[in-house]
Amino acid sequence: MRWFLETIKKKIKTGDKVRFVGGGALSPVTAGILADVLQIPVETVPEPQNVGAVGAALAVAVGLGRIADLKDVEALIKPNRVFMPNPDARAVHDKNYVAFTRLYSANKKLFHHLNQIH
């Protein structure tokens, strides 16, 4: 996740927080770890496992003119919790991140080979 976020930040302007959705967001432990790994606040929403259906319904509402603009949707979905990064966890996650990126680089050809096996 951190590598992906850092790559995105090089290409486009991003926000200063992440909204964590899906079934994994039901776990406060997972949300807290994500905040520590990314070192930015992580928001969760009520019933995060249903965001796909909620998003589809809101897109339909915009299409039908019940909601004026897609930009207005953000105000309708408010976070129910915000997980702040633990500064004390930063050193261990930074160390592990460096190790992960080195392991990936050293094994990139092997990963490619494994992905070609059917």
Predicted feature residues:
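Glycine/Thr-rich phosphate-binding loops that ligate phosphate moieties of nucleotide
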Residues: 1-118
